[in-house]
């Protein structure tokens, strides 16, 4: 047993302990050729490293586990795509190295409690509930990301640094309930869904120069934002800027269509 998976050394396969669950992590280990388990060279860590060689890759995959067999580290240098619910129920992962990852499905690392930094330099597209409820994540760098689904980084209480320079389109509930983020720059963003940046109490600076369309409840219940300039915005839904008590300056030169409860 490792975490909630069964690693079968004889049959050379990894499967879920609960067959009724689905986890994209399992599909990263098809066509296994060799499994080797080693003690970590750093004695104080009291961890072990599982090294897996597959027929599909020249480079080995490594999984680090703690003394209780929880997965705390994962490195796969050639992985480009993962399916839904990747390590969704893992709570102890603190190191993740996926330098070639391009696309992920829904529920990616949804309930992780230890990951504090993450760099996915090639990632371009993610599904719903990406890194949702990750209480320790403070820095995230996704320089190639262009599109995200619903629930992106929802309720990440420690996130204070976010780099998404190529992001163009986001779904509903983007970055809701993020209590530490004070600045956000999304220079290429053009379209957002409902409840964008809801309840971000520390957000005081926001730059969205290309934004043209937003859904309902754009930046509701923000307590710090005093200035907002959206030079390309043409259309907004209901509840635009609901309960933004500190907003003093607003510039929307291209706006032509608004929903109900505008600036309520």
Predicted features along the sequence, with ranges:
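Intrinsically disordered, low-structural-confidence terminal and linker regions
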Residues: 8-9
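Cullin-RING E3 adaptor/co-adaptor recruitment helices
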Residues: 16-18
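LRR N-terminal entry segment and analogous cap-like coil->beta motifs
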Residues: 22-93, 97-98, 103-105, 127
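Structural signature of tandem-repeat unit edges
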Residues: 59-60, 67-80, 92-102, 114-124, ...
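Concave beta-strand-loop units of leucine-rich repeat
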Residues: 76-77, 85-92, 103-114, 127-136, ...
């Amino acid at each position: 047993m490792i975490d909630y998976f069964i690693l079968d050394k004889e049959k050379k396969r990894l499967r879920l302990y609960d067959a009724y669950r689905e986890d994209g992590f399992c599909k990263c280990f098809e066509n296994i050729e060799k499994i080797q388990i080693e003690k970590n060279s750093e004695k104080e860590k009291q961890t072990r490293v599982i090294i897996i060689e597959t027929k599909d890759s020249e480079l080995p995959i490594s999984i680090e586990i703690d003394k209780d067999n929880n997965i705390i580290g994962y490195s796969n240098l050639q992985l480009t795509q993962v399916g839904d619910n990747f390590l969704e129920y893992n709570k102890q992962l603190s190191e993740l190295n996926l330098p070639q990852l391009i696309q992920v499905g829904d529920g990616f690392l949804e309930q992780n409690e230890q990951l504090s930094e993450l760099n996915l330099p090639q990632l371009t597209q993610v599904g719903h509930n990406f890194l949702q409820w990750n209480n320790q994540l403070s820095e995230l760098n996704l320089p190639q990301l262009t599109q995200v689904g619903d629930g992106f980084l929802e309720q990440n209480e420690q996130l204070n640094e976010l780099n998404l320079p190529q992001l163009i389109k986001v779904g509903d509930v983007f970055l809701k309930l993020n209590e530490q983020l004070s600045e956000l720059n999304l220079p290429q963003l053009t379209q957002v869904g409902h409840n964008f940046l809801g309840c971000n109490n520390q957000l005081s600076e926001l730059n969205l120069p290309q934004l043209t369309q937003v859904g309902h409840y754009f930046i509701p219940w923000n307590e710090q934002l005093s200035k907002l300039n959206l030079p390309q915005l043409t259309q907004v839904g209901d509840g635009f800027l609901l309960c933004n008590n500190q907003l003093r300056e607003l510039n929307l030169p291209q706006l032509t269509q608004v929903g109900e409860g505008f600036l309520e």
